[in-house]
């Protein structure tokens, strides 16, 4: 029993250790991309191309519609941002069944939508992405409140405000795309004074903040792009294994408890020394059967547990009279 318990404890420790290692690995591999401020002053939207990103599975991206306050410059821009297919992105059109990711219609607060690039979403309405596949985000609004619900054209056509997300792909394979558009860590452009060009034009950025586009550690991103899916598979396997172990332990405990209830606590045998003196007639000459009186209660008083509990409620003890053939064991004595 002690050995089995120690084995179970070791299995639990191994599973928890494996889960912790996988969690740390997944967290260390995931990157929070530089946020995208959705407005016409964002110079990252290149004419005829838009904004090209190379996110990996596990990364996160924030799309923000900045608010208007006392420090802002210009007017608030109203947009509805959609995720569409390639044909819609090329023609700058949306369909009625498309659901907006962002509804930028609150000038007094930031409106943000966070995209988590994951292959499997725990949310029913969550976004799911596949490696080596392209995804598109556009807006057909024109920036004014009256043109908020436009279904074609808009800033997608006039200002190339659209995002191409090449999930799980390497920016180096796209030739000079790294020099003309942002990747996982967009490089700083000339003339930004050390600030990222995706900074909102309405909010003054912190002068001390800067983004390094040459951070190390991104060369092996495509080799381990599916570590989150691997982590999810191993984690689910460990959880199923733990549930099976718990179920088996519970069933074993129930079986033992039931077995204890139905099995006798002691193996008792009738002692012939407790038998009453047999009745014998004067003319049987050892040929007639003897009347042996066997008490229901044995010497150790555990032969009938139920009788022990309730016998006092029913009066005198009850005896069973059994007919037995004549015998002469060593511990039975006859009256002469």
UniProtKB/Swiss-Prot annotation:
Coiled coil: none annotated. Residues 170-216 are annotated as: Disordered. Residues 254-336 are cytoplasmic. Its main location: membrane. SUPFAM superfamilies: Cupredoxins (SSF49503). Residues 29-232 are extracellular. Keywords: Angiogenesis, Cell junction, Cell membrane, Developmental protein, Differentiation, Disulfide bond, Glycoprotein, Membrane, Methylation, Neurogenesis, Phosphoprotein, Signal, Transmembrane, Transmembrane helix. One of its GO terms (cellular component) is Schaffer collateral - CA1 synapse. Gene3D superfamilies: Cupredoxins - blue copper proteins. It is a single-pass type I membrane protein. Belongs to the ephrin family. GO terms for biological process: adherens junction organization; animal organ morphogenesis; blood vessel morphogenesis; cell adhesion; cell differentiation; cell migration involved in sprouting angiogenesis; cellular response to lipopolysaccharide; ephrin receptor signaling pathway. A motif (PDZ-binding) lies at residues 334-336. Residues 193-216 have a biased composition (Polar residues). This is Ephrin-B2. InterPro entries: Cupredoxin (IPR008972), Ephrin (IPR031328), Ephrin-B_Ecto (IPR034255), Ephrin_CS (IPR019765), Ephrin_RBD (IPR001799). Cell surface transmembrane ligand for Eph receptors, a family of receptor tyrosine kinases which are crucial for migration, repulsion and adhesion during neuronal, vascular and epithelial development. Binds promiscuously Eph receptors residing on adjacent cells, leading to contact-dependent bidirectional signaling into neighboring cells. The signaling pathway downstream of the receptor is referred to as forward signaling while the signaling pathway downstream of the ephrin ligand is referred to as reverse signaling. Binds to receptor tyrosine kinase including EPHA4, EPHA3 and EPHB4. The chain crosses the membrane at residues 233-253. Disulfide bonds join 65-104, 92-156. CDD domains: Ephrin-B_Ectodomain.
